Amino acid sequence: MGIKGLNAIISEHVPSAVRKSDIKAFFGRKVAIDASMSLYQFLIAVRQQDGAQLSTESGETTSHLMGMFYRTLRMIDNGIKPCYVFDGKPPILKSFELKKRSDKRVDTEKKLEEAVDQAEKLKQERRLVKVSPEHNDEAKYLLKLMGIPYIVAPCEAEAQCAQLAKDGKVYAAASEDMDTLCYKTPYLLRHLTFSEAKKEPIHEIDTELVLQGLELTQEQFVDLGIMLGCDYCESIRGIGPVTALKLIKEHGSLEKIVEFIESGQANNKWKVPEDWPYNEARQLFLNPDVVNSQDINLKWNPPDEEKLIEFLCHEKKFNEERVKSGIKRLQKGLKSGVQVRLDGFFQKVPKTKEQLAAATAKAKAAKKTKGKTGKVSKR
């Protein structure tokens, strides 16, 4: 689910922390991708013209494999070395969110039964999309045949992606979930696995610039995320993004905010949830269950052409000519290796408050300018 309203806060207060770039800008980068989120996207977006999921004659869904194969190829074509991270066992605190999703699913199934209009049916069907263990297993098998490394995280995939980026194994974590920032990935890439047809630039969020711009510590930023609403516990009803940021800045921590509310100084406008496990949620962000990066060896291998054709073409009925063309692209891209970028020789220099304020003002002015060209950075 991510963090409600966090993207809006960053866009409003620190737009300079977000760089919109073409995929070519990440040539030579290694990136850790949230596999579960990507598979969900593929199941939602990769469809036939009538809106139905791609499938074999026997009814087996193949949208996830089509998306995984061709979106990964696009990255390889542009000099990116992807590795995928799959979710492990969800933390106990997440049962709160999983229960909510289960309840919503029951409601959606009812709406689907009642739907008469075809467009409404497709809308409700998309809401019922769920990544199954079979989808995950098939995606892992495909990645193995493609020669693309993958990891199964002990817990949350976003946390493991962030850890790989923090430890320098990869440049950035890629996910649509904004809570990846709470695990303090240096950079978060959004829209990386979107289709080329969408023409959506990749959004690169610099975590350090976000913290500087909001004038928050990492711990305070995590507390802000919990107040906005995360997967691990409910939020305080009635407190939206503007108020949440104001309270964190004024009081500095959730402990102080809870004390402020329960003392009656907030005029009883809000009520803290009973037995609110905000500290446990905080620890899941600050000290997540991840594999030590030193124990992970990311290696990109030559694709297994014969088995790829057998799996995708003979078993899943993909177009053989297109798959063979894709394999050639894969062989070429993986053979070339990761080229060294010139900016890799230079240490990142933190921006001063004045520089950050100037950049933020410039970014805000650009957003307000009419007749935007829509061009993205090529770096």
Curated annotation (Swiss-Prot):
Gene field: FEN1
Broad class of where this protein is predominantly found: nucleus
Assembly and interaction partners: Interacts with PCNA. Three molecules of FEN1 bind to one PCNA trimer with each molecule binding to one PCNA monomer. PCNA stimulates the nuclease activity without altering cleavage specificity.
Sequence positions that bind Mg(2+) 2: 177, 179, 231
Residue span of region I-domain: 120-251
GO cellular component, one term: nucleoplasm
Post-translational modification: Phosphorylated. Phosphorylation upon DNA damage induces relocalization to the nuclear plasma.
Taxonomic lineage: Eukaryota, Fungi, Dikarya, Ascomycota, Saccharomycotina
Top class in the EC scheme: hydrolase
Region of interest (Disordered), residue spans: 360-379
Species the sequence originates in: Zygosaccharomyces rouxii (strain ATCC 2623 / CBS 732 / NBRC 1130 / NCYC 568 / NRRL Y-229)
Protein name: Flap endonuclease 1
Protein EC: 3.1.-.-
Sequence segments annotated as region (Interaction with PCNA): 338-346
InterPro entries, alphabetized: 5-3_exonuclease_C_sf (IPR036279), Flap_endonuc (IPR023426), HhH2 (IPR008918), PIN-like_dom_sf (IPR029060), XPG-I_dom (IPR006086), XPG/Rad2 (IPR006084), XPG_CS (IPR019974), XPG_DNA_repair_N (IPR006085)
Keywords tagged on the record: DNA damage, DNA repair, DNA replication, Endonuclease, Exonuclease, Hydrolase, Magnesium, Metal-binding, Mitochondrion, Nuclease, Nucleus, Phosphoprotein
Cofactor dependence: Mg(2+)
